Amino acid sequence: MSHSTHPYQKELEVATLAVKRASLLTKQLSDSIVQTAKSGTLTKDDKSPVTIGDFASQAIINHAIKLNFPNDEIVGEEDSRELQENTGLADQMLQLITKIQKETSGYNDIVGTLTDKNEVYQSIDFGNSQGGSKGRFWALDPIDGTKGFLRGDQFAVCLALIEDGKVVLGVIGCPNLSENIVSNEEHSGVVGGLYSAVKGVGSFYSELFKEGAEPLSQQKRIKMQNHTNPSQLKVVEGVEKGHSSHSTQTEIKAKFGFDSATVAKQTINLDSQVKYCVLASGQADIYLRLPVNETYREKIWDHAAGNILIYESGGQVGDVTGSPLNFGNGRTLDSKGVIAANKGIFDKVIDAVTEVRK
């Protein structure tokens, strides 16, 4: 299927502009939080900046989807109850949305505008779908990587379209991600990346803060590498130890054949679905997210967009048994953990996971 003939052109345009607008808002908010923290006026327990960012991002994107595809459902992370109980937060959020709509006024004809709090509440609550294996719905994570967002580090705005339980389109805005990631310390190139994938078409990279929605033909096609030798491989993992079992992941790398003297340099720690973007663009080879406990179930919005990005760039994604992730199970995945790798080593990675988890 070519760049210009795929059946999701309108969906991709709407998703791209909505994610760009939400990414710009969350980037500005994250930067201001970091500055406030440096001045000592932000307390550790103050969750309001994240709350505002989450709600504003979800409102912008949900509004754009419902404006263009009124029959589509949305599985979103937030509902508006907390916001309606705190009019101060709601006022701050509406000010941010109004500001960003003016700064991206060229997008208004396609993604629309929000003008009052009730409209914002309604848009947020469009995200109440339970998902499922039939029909068409979107999965949204308005700010993926909360800790990274607060640190001024990596976070992402993630949107995916799911049809009959299968992801067919994904868009991930990465406001703080450099184009080139060599190690935890070495980042270079343009900061701010937009990663998109369409089923049967491919995965693509473009500059996040470049105005408008570039057609795929003008974007950079990205592909995973086919490295197989452990000395060549790089692994992406989360930063927060509460989200995945780093100790188990260390054992898996050893079992796979990583050299203990170099494995630390071969591991890149990143918050959010930017890990999928680094993998899909060929800058890493394995993504490990082992469950911290056996009862935890991943949310679909944490993986849907990244899932199609990996497949369309030539990789493979599964749970700890290697089975494909099931996005038709409702709001959560019915499996444990997430593993992604290039197709040449995926089965070997799963073998190592199985050995360690015995």
Curated annotation (Swiss-Prot):
Give the InterPro entries listed for this entry.
DPNP, Inositol_monoP_metal-BS, Inositol_monoP_superfamily, Inositol_monophosphatase-like, Inositol_monophosphatase_CS
SUPFAM superfamilies in UniProt = Carbohydrate phosphatase
Cofactor binding mode and count: Binds 3 Mg(2+) ions per subunit.
* Gene Ontology MF term list: 3'(2'),5'-bisphosphate nucleotidase activity; metal ion binding; nucleotide binding
Tell me the Gene Ontology biological-process terms attached to this UniProt entry.
amino acid biosynthetic process; phosphatidylinositol phosphate biosynthetic process; sulfate assimilation
First-tier enzyme category under EC: hydrolase
Which one Pfam family would you cite for this protein? Inositol_P
Sites where the protein binds Mg(2+) 2: D141, D144, D302
Q: What is its EC number?
A: 3.1.3.7
List the catalytic residues.
D54 (proton acceptor), T146 (proton acceptor)
Binding annotation for AMP: H243, S272, K275, R289, D302
Similarity comment text for this entry: Belongs to the inositol monophosphatase superfamily.
- Its biological purpose: Phosphatase that converts adenosine 3'-phosphate 5'-phosphosulfate (PAPS) to adenosine 5'-phosphosulfate (APS) and 3'(2')-phosphoadenosine 5'-phosphate (PAP) to AMP. Regulates the flux of sulfur in the sulfur-activation pathway by converting PAPS to APS. Involved in salt tolerance.
The protein depicted here goes by the name 3'(2'),5'-bisphosphate nucleotidase 2
Species = Candida albicans (strain SC5314 / ATCC MYA-2876) (Yeast)
| Classification of source organism | Eukaryota, Fungi, Dikarya, Ascomycota, Saccharomycotina
- Name the gene for this chain: HAL22
